[in-house]
């Protein structure tokens, strides 16, 4: 896939939208000026994916796609 997605805002909704796009195979960049919040959300979503893998709802490739396709950005210029 050559499509790229930019999500502006890494709160609860933005982080979930970015995670779904990344798991679907899209190169996804998420921007938030609050570095601590964005890193917290990244780890929170990662743990949720691991729980869904444990429950056999997702396969391991979803976690790999999430990690490979999601970029965290703290500068708006880097996202667009």
Kindly give the residue locations of the regions a language model identified.
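A structured beta-alpha segment of the ubiquitous adenosine-cofactor-binding alpha/beta core
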Residues: 51-80
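NAD(P)+-binding Rossmann beta1-loop-alpha1 motif at the extreme N-terminus of oxidoreductases
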Residues: 1-51, 55, 71
């Amino acid at each position: 896939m050559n499509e790229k997605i930019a999500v502006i805002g890494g709160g609860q909704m933005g982080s979930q939208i970015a995670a779904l796009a990344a798991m679907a195979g899209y190169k996804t960049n998420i921007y938030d000026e609050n570095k601590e919040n964005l890193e917290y959300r990244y780890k929170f979503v990662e743990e949720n994916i691991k729980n869904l893998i444990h429950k056999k709802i997702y396969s391991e490739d979803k976690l790999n796609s999430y990690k490979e396709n999601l970029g965290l950005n703290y500068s708006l210029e880097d996202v667009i």
